[in-house]
């Protein structure tokens, strides 16, 4: 059994499509997969990341706790809706209930690593510590990514949360000078596990499966679950 939290260097970097791609690659390797997103914001505009993972990767074990209408940080979205954030133990129980032998459980955060997900001030990093999970960090290839990535990895290391690697959430075709340079530099910071092509979320399920299998190293994926 393996729990992996999927975080990012910010909002809109591609965490959901990375969750879906890794889930698809794992399922194609014969691994049972569950995906959890404890907190979802932006439901008023139709945001539903778990449904997107199900559509792209065919995962049926999908779990969430709190949903807020406005596309804001969870604490702000909850306040705007007159609702509360979930409690820390609720999130931990949700993840623990999904975890089982032979299964890869992916936990997608909201925004970046230190965004408040539960009261009082509980972040995805805290949850990772609670469930003994490593973190896969979704990054961009854009200017500024090196600083954002290093800050995220330092925040993980400060609480002894191991980094399972980096994934570039949207890789341009063709890559420009900045993107190509940043990809090389990112690989010197941590292992780059995959670079997903820009627009991957628009693929149909069959093409998405093929892309996912090609994007990740099969041996690494197979080794995620002991």
From Swiss-Prot:
It holds the Pfam family AAA_26. Its EC number is 6.3.3.3. The active site is at 37. It is an enzyme of class 6 (ligase). GO terms for cellular component: cytosol. ATP binds at residue 49. It catalyses: (7R,8S)-7,8-diammoniononanoate + CO2 + ATP = (4R,5S)-dethiobiotin + ADP + phosphate + 3 H(+). Homodimer. This is Dethiobiotin synthetase BioD. It comes from Mycobacterium tuberculosis (strain ATCC 25618 / H37Rv).
């Amino acid at each position: 059994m393996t729990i992996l939290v999927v975080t990012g260097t910010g909002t809109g970097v591609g965490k959901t499509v990375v969750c879906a791609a890794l889930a698809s690659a794992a399922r194609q390797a014969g691994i049972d997969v569950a995906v959890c997103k404890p907190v979802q914001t932006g439901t008023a505009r139709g945001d539903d990341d778990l449904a997107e993972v199900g559509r792209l990767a065919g995962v049926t074990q999908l779990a969430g706790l709190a949903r807020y209408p406005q596309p804001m940080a969870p604490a702000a979205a909850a306040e705007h809706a007159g609702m509360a954030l979930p409690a820390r133990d609720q999130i931990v129980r949700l993840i623990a209930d999904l975890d089982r032998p032979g299964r890869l459980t992916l936990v997608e955060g909201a925004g970046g690593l230190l965004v408040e997900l539960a009261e009082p001030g509980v972040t995805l990093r805290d949850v990772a510590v609670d469930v003994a999970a490593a973190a896969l960090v979704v990054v961009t290839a854009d200017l500024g990514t090196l600083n954002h990535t290093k800050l995220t990895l330092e925040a993980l290391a400060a609480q002894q949360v191991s980094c399972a690697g980096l994934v570039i959430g949207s890789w341009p075709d063709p890559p420009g000078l900045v993107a190509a340079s940043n990809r090389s530099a990112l690989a010197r910071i941590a292992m780059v596990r995959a670079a997903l092509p820009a627009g991957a979320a628009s693929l149909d399920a069959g093409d998405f499966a093929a892309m996912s299998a090609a994007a990740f190293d099969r041996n690494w994926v197979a080794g995620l679950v002991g």
